[in-house]
Structure formats: C-alpha cells, structure tokens
C-alpha cells in the first residue's frame, strides 16, 4: 500500500494544487503595511513579521507603548509561520511552557472577536498516545501538572481513544492522555490578526523591508540600518526566526543566538469521502514519531524523524522562504507509522508533501530575553516547532520584560543568557539540532544527557577522572562527573538504563555518600563560575555592598554567602564571596551563571578605571574535599593546622598544598558536611589531585560526583540557584533571612522590596518534604515539578529532590502557597500555616504522604561518629 500511495503522489506532482496551498494573503489586507518612507526614529523596532514579531508588537501596544515599528523582509506571516501545522498543544513538560501555551490558547480563542479576522480557531482537543508503560508514566506526570494549573486533562483507555477518533488503530496502546481544550488554528491568520490589532493600537508595520544590522554605541542599541534607511531606536527585538542567528552576528557588536534550522515534513491529503467531524481530536503518537490532525476534510500528518536534515548551515538564504524539495524516501518511516496508526489512509489520495524549515536550539527550549552584551537588544526565536503553541505567551512575557523589567513568570530556562558564545559555532549547532529534533518525541526520562557537542569544556583532570570510571553530565558546555563506576560494573548497561523508578546508579551513589560522611571524597567542581573584583581604593567594596544583600565588609579571609538581588528582591544570583585582601574579592557562582552574572555586574558596576572585574573561571580547577577526614588529608599536605580552631568555618586562605603554592583553600563544601574547597591554578591541578589521592589512601579517599553532592545538599535543606531559587524568589521566602543585612549601613538593590515584604509577609515559603509511605524500590521516584497538596488542596510544586541515604527517605524541596478557597488568590504564608498542614506529593497521579519541615532534620545528624572509630577498610579499593 505504501507504493500505491507513492504512485499517487507522483501523479499529483504536476497538479496545480501543489503550487497553491497555504499562500499567505497580502499583509495589506489586514494590517497597514506601509510602502512610504520609514520613520526617522521609534522607541522600539521589531524585526520579523511572523507570529513571534506580531505577538510582541501586539502585547507591547496593549501595555501602552505606542512608538513601535515592525519590519518584515517579505510579507507578513509568509515565513515559517505560513507552513506551521496549526496545532495548539498545552501538554508541555515545562511548567513555564505550559503557562505560555495555555495563555496562547485563550488569546487565539478571542482574537476573531477582537479583530474581526477569521483565524480558523477550532477547539478539537488532543490525544497523546502511549504504546509503552514508560510513555504512559510520562503522560501521567504531565497530566498531574496540567490539572493543577487549570488545564483540563485526563488519562483515558485505548477503548476511549477509539470512541474519540474512530479511524485509529488502538490495538498496541496501553493508554493515552486527553486534553479537551487543545485546538487547531491557521497560524498565518493568527499572525495577521495580531498585526491588525497592533496596527489599530498605533504600531507601524512595514513589509518588504530588510534589517541589515543593528546600530550600537557604548553597549546600547541606538538604531537599525535597513535596506530603506536608518531608524533611531532605544529597543530592538530580534524575531527573525531562522535568520535570528545571522542577524545577531551582523551587529556592530556580534551577538550569539544559538539556533539552527532543520527540514520538517508533513503531508496533506484530499478529503475523505465521508469527512471526520470537524472537532475530531488531534493525535500525537510520540512512540510512532507522528502527529495527525483534520485538514480541509482530509488530514495533515507529520512528525519528527530520527535522522533529521539540518539546512542553511552556510548562512542566510536571501530568498523569501518557499516550500523546500520533497523527499519521500526520507519521509517513508513516518508514512509507514501513519499507515499503521490509521490504516484507512490506504485509500486516501495524497495531495502534497510539505517540506519547510523549523528552527531548533541546543537544549530544545526557546530563546528569549535581553542580550548580555547590548542593552536594549531583545530576542524571541528558536521555537523548536512549538511557535504557534508558545507564541502568544512568549510575546506577552517578552513584552513584560521590556516594559516592567521582568516577566511575570520565572523564564530562566528560556533566557538567552543561559547560553554562551561557546554554544554558537555552526558545527556545534548543526550536530546538536540533529539530536534535538528527534528528542521532541523521544521519551524524556529524568537525568538524560545530550550526546552531541560534548567535551567542549573540560577540567584539566578530565582524562584522569574518565580513566577512573567517571560518568559525565554537561552543564553550560562543561563536563561534570555524575558518579564513578567501579571496575566490576557494566558501563554500557548502566549508561543505557533509563527509568522513572529506582536507577541503576543507586548503590554507586550510596557508597559515595557514605564515604563523604565517614571518610573523605573528592568532587571536581571546576565548572563553577569564578570572578575577581579588585580596585585601587574602596570602589570594589562599595560597589559590592550595593549589589549584594549581605554585609561584605568583613575581615580579610572571611567568606560570605549572599544573594545578588533585583529591585523586587528576587535572586539574580546566589553566591559565595571571599575577601582576599582589603581591596579584592573572589566570587563563586553556579556554573550557568557565567554569562548572566557577568552581564549583571557589568550593568551595575561603575565604569571606573580603578575597578577591575575579571572572569577567572578558566584559571582555577576546583576540588571539593568532603568528609571528616578531609582535615587530615589537607593537614598532611600543607604542614599546617586545619582544625576549626586554626581554620574556622567560612574562612579562606592561600596555602601550599604539596609542591604547589597559591592554592585558595576555603572551609566550605556546599553540602553542610565538613571539608574544604580547593581553588587551584590550572597548571598545578594534576599535581594537587595526585597528591590528595595519594595521601588520602590511608584515610579511605575516593572520587565522587554531583549526584552524591545533590543528595547531601538536599537532605541538609541547601537551596541552589536555578533549581530552588530564581529571580522571583526572595531570601525571606526561602529561609535566607540570615544572609540579608537590612541595616548594614548602605543601601542595596532589593532592600526596599525586602523591607516591604517583611512588613506584609510572604506569599510562598520553601519547605523540605520527607516522603513517608514511599517505597524506594517499587514506587516511581520524585524528581522535580511534582504538585504539592496541603490538606487535599493544591499548594505548590517541588523544585528539586533526592534520595537521602542518611534518612533512608526521599526528600523534596518545594514552595508552599496559601490559595484562598473562595477566590483562589494567594494569601500570606506563616510558619504556623506550614506546620499545621498535612502534605502529599503527587508523582504521576499517585499521592504520597510527606512531612513538611522548615529547617533541616538535625536529629538525624547528631550521631556523628568520631573519625578515629571509622573502619577505613570499608573504603579502601572502592
């Protein structure tokens, strides 16, 4: 039957219908597209007339900004937006993407009434199919998250699937998820409706106008150069879709926007003899790698193949996007999957195979936010084939970012500043997107890692650790050890093991954690971001006092844990700062803060020749010596007393370790366990590591990885930025009051907001949850994002979790809210409110009882054994 379908296709290739589908209507029919001279100046210039650009223009104008110009190189909605399959799905793995898609759905639903332009919006619902139990678990996790944010959904049986869509073959299904309010829509018409509404609000729209480059002066946008002249402006928004990468590089100060295009295929058929009902649900068969929707009485079906075809690697195609060449051989696996799922298609005539470009990013999430190097330069691009679903919400969040300084939701996982220039080479992007595109429909189990673009940034110890069994994860392009596999383990089986249940590395991490608590372990943490701030006078101290909420005017050698807050009191960074001398400071931040923190510091530090900010991440290898025997190892290597009397907690000192001088030794471990961080000049890294491992043998030393670190820090209730802390989280909401000095004698960013919050109270509170009735061996594991229930009512979600080998329980961190039963509005959360509740954690639809704590469970840690009693033979050779 496949060959019969292909023969029909061959006959239809000469049909006029092949050339007429989805021709975007003239932009002048719905929005005032000007052919007159461009204005000399504007407040905002937006590049791109697809759904992203028109959404940003629409929302900026709704928020009161009027002096806006939108430029499109071709016709409005005639780029990738024109070829969009028109499926609006709210079933996303990411919480912020769920909210963006839900907002988009509501926005598109009312656009016809607002503008009078038909958008083809039809609420059909969607059904996501599961051929395996693991896929069903994944859908159940999504379902539980959708329900708590007000998106109706349910898990249904194969029989119910057949009732909702009678043409589907359901014999191989184990279940499905039904989302009744998902929709289909004409993406081009949505973009034109948004443009029309924006135009009515004063936005000036010019088509057939190309942006050549952005004008920049002293790190600030000053205007744009187009093929029709210059426009002075304060803000520029790059919504150029697949050309956003090229446009970013064309600036006077090049900007890296890491995205790359791939070919994306879907077919269109002639109508059925007896058409399906117009509201027949859209089908997503991720295990079969296909999607199916009604289209003009027939069907539209495409998918995400395992072997995608990247395009335009060499640079920008100057022509307006057209349908790319058909490739039926490439599409054949998807077509076969389609015929298995819908056998009745054998008799249906195929009209056309559409091949259009779609853009993808290195981590499968869209890119939005302000440039780290140019103020006033914003980006919204790289939608990973979800532009229609996310476009309305993404445009709203970016407009809020521009107007108010911050979006209303935490969008760090989408922020342009999560990437560095190192992730923007053409070769890297070409290889990475070939992995990303199939991942859209691949089963996403916890803790999976990308396989392409690896070993981009490594510690000097990488080869040494790799030879000792290190298994690697990647963060901001940096390789970090997850755990170390003993020689007798099957490495291949361990790496290929993917599960929502107890992982195969459980026992390995347990032995690493035990060693951290009873002997000594070494974790390579070289990926940490490291800055030095120095001055000739007091400028460094004065500037840092303004930028950070804790008091940094401490004696030389002391370390301060502190937040770098925004004006709303939220965490832009959570870091440790050591005072090296009276006028120099050493700042340690999370790995993925390298670009963001650098941009923030450069934005607020005075432009003073006496003040120097230097990124020294690459200069130092960082080793974390954790455990009660760390003091013995370091004492023997340095011939210096390292006991608390001589080297108190949160103290920093440059010392000799082995033969190496200038090692910055800090009495902290980021876990609450005893030990030291060693910041080693990279030329000494191998020597110091070898000496530590050699001397440490008699103390039971071994390597450990970040999985052990996570277990240790979560059981001690240590919140990490990017997971538990973000720009919308304040110190008062996460138990960080002790790291805020409101009366330190100098104003700091966020102080007014914290003073106000201290008076009014907090509306959420970070708590620690210990699962009671959870069977580690048999039950699904928590990871992050699980709904939290208080007294049977939704109260928040988890932010991170780990198994505590000390408590022999799973521990989750998460925020508790107090939602009014009458209005649903948030109310003040008090300590009493937390303590009086009975809690459950929802894991894929099953609720597990949990105890909530606002402080670490210290009673479990009071039985510390004396180091002399440790049976060191337990650790030798492991």
Curated annotation (Swiss-Prot):
Tagged with keyword Coiled coil: no
Gene designation: Pdpr
Chief location bin: mitochondrion
Subunit-level organization: Heterodimer of a catalytic (PDP1) and a regulatory (PDPR) subunit.
GO cellular component: mitochondrial matrix; mitochondrion
Pfam families the UniProt entry points to: DAO, FAO_M, GCV_T, GCV_T_C
Species annotation: Mus musculus
Residues spanning the membrane: none
Name recorded for this polypeptide: Pyruvate dehydrogenase phosphatase regulatory subunit, mitochondrial
Top-level division of the source organism's lineage: Eukaryota
Key words of the record: Mitochondrion, Transit peptide
